């Protein structure tokens, strides 16, 4: 559960309505893989991840980034029940994929940076603070199975 004020919730929702999920998803996942190269081990089947350009232009990275942001969108629609919303994904990432839960926090922070880059002055300190709460809540929900 994420505790947002009415203003914060409105700001998150308003900005998210302008997000190009295809573009931002691929960019966020790509940046995660470039900045934290050890995360690439979870994506062996994605082909060429040998350079930043290869990662950022990889169609499988872009497609999976879109899928990740689709799940994030579901979370935004269920902020009062993030653990329930992400229960299956938490189980998958814990039991089958063995993804360290810290990676969820890293991806959330990268997503905030990508949103700031795309929205510039519209991504005010107040909007950033609200999004930090949301990505922390999502990361916590995804890590729930690990506890």
Swiss-Prot record:
InterPro entries the record matches: Globin (IPR000971), Globin-like_sf (IPR009050), Globin/Proto (IPR012292), Hemoglobin_b (IPR002337), Hemoglobin_oxygen_transport (IPR050056)
Keywords assigned: Acetylation, Heme, Iron, Metal-binding, Oxygen transport, Phosphoprotein, S-nitrosylation, Transport
BP terms from Gene Ontology: hydrogen peroxide catabolic process
Residue ranges of domain Globin in the record: 3-147
Residues carrying N6-acetyllysine: 60, 83, 145
Binding-site list for heme b: 64, 93
Residues with Phosphoserine modification: 45
Similarity field: Belongs to the globin family.
Function: Involved in oxygen transport from the lung to the various peripheral tissues.
Protein known as: Hemoglobin subunit beta
Species this protein is from: Aotus azarae
């Amino acid at each position: 559960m994420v505790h947002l004020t009415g203003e914060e919730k409105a700001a998150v929702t308003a900005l998210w309505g302008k997000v190009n999920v295809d573009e931002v998803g691929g960019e966020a996942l790509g940046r995660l893989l470039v900045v934290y190269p050890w995360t690439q081990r979870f994506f062996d089947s994605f082909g060429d991840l040998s350079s930043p350009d290869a990662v950022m232009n990889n169609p499988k990275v872009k497609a999976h980034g879109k899928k990740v942001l689709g799940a994030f969108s579901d979370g935004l629609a269920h902020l009062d029940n993030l653990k329930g919303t992400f229960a299956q994904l938490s189980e998958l990432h814990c039991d089958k994929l063995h993804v360290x839960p810290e990676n969820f926090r890293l991806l959330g922070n990268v997503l905030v940076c990508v949103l700031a880059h795309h929205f510039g002055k519209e991504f005010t300190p107040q909007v950033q603070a609200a999004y930090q709460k949301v990505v922390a809540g999502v990361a916590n929900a995804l890590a729930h199975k690990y506890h």
